[in-house]
Amino acid sequence: MEKKIITISREFGSGGRTIGRQLAEKLGIPFYDEELVDQVSLESGFAPKFIEEHSEHSPGKSFLSYVFAPQGVPGVMNGLSTADFLWSIQCSVILQLADKGPCVIVGRNADYVLKDRDDCLHAFIYADMDYRADRIVRLYGESEKSPEVRLQEKDKRRKVNYQHYTGRSWGQAQNYDVCLCSSTLGEEHCVQILLEMVQNQNNK
């Protein structure tokens, strides 16, 4: 089966977003990251920044789940938590983007949302702690928290969110077609491996 859709799941700071963007450029296909968030924002009524900050949070019907919801948002007004409402919209948007044609989608549990499609290649990018810590400091600067703590907190949110909505273990090899260590291979080599995988599948 020809692989048209590539999903990139990743540990925070591993370079998965960069790898996905470069892969999309080499394949000449759309890359969905911020664009996906913008579409979810358009359909949900939430600001993109709010979605970025809350779509990976653990679900729950706490008071704060409703306080920050835009007035009149149907899902939230009907009793869904903000996290559940965003998940519903996010799934819909991912399916729409995949139906449009070949693309690379980063994060957002897209590997699970598109698990029933045969034309997808699902990748997970990880890296060792020192590599990731150095990378986020270079990209995002210092913080009151150590880079190691920031990495652990971000990864934990992704892990809990993924497990809740998919019933799977985040980062477990059996959930993906390939897992690549960017700190060992380097970002460029990761891109090349994924490119060759897509091309080999499409040439069969």
Question: Positions of the model-derived regions?
Answer:
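Pre-Walker A (Motif I) flank of P-loop NTPase domains
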Residues: E2-R10, G101
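Short beta-strand-centered segment that lines the nucleotide-binding/catalytic pocket of NTP-utilizing
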Residues: P30-S41
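ATP-dependent small-molecule kinase phosphotransfer cores
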Residues: S41-P102
